[in-house]
Amino acid sequence: LSIAVRPLTGAEIAAALDDLAQLRITVFAAYPYLYDGDATYEAEYLAEYAAAPDAVLVAAFDGARVVGAATAAPMMHQKAEFRAPFEARGIDTSRLFYFGESVLLPDYRGHGIGHAFFDHREAQAVRCGANAACFAAVVRADDHPAKPQDYSPLDAFWARRGYAVVPDLTAELAWKEHGDEAEKVNVMQYWMRTW
């Protein structure tokens, strides 16, 4: 497998947003997110993201095809619902980087691309003066009816990267899941690493 992984910034991010939107819709449709993606919402969300100063999109290319992507930007440029749990606990978000989605098509998993995504995002965070990074992962019950029998959570991978769950630090985000008529609120657990 010959995959090129590289960070995109500025105008390069804008050029890759359609690919990122399609990847989000495709990858997040699966468990544990079960996201019923909406192209209009994706365009708005990603345009906001691309406008954030110091944002980076790390893309994985198989030839010219984007097969994976991961995003990061300073937490202070994220929406209030992402910042609020930190601010409520008195955590300074001015030197905190938020790692957004990390999406990779299934055929490309298990080849070190996830590590490359973290390496590039962490490097951008350090370049921008951050002393910590965080991300949020959806919380699902162990007996969730949509959970595949062979599902393997990423907790051990994240822990090997130096990230840990921050107890009681969660956000609530709403999205429409497959089979539902309306959005429902989901709990997102924050993981964090300092350096």
Locate each region found by the language model:
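Helix-loop element at the rim of GNAT/NAT acetyltransferase active sites that forms part
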Residues: 21-37
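Active-site rim helix/loop that mediates acceptor-substrate recognition in acyltransferases
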Residues: 33-62, 71
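Short hydrophobic/aromatic beta-strand element in the GNAT-like acyltransferase core
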Residues: 54-59, 69, 101, 188-190
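Conserved acyl-donor/pantetheine-binding loop and adjacent beta-alpha core of acyl/acetyltransferases
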Residues: 69-102, 145-146, 151, 169-184
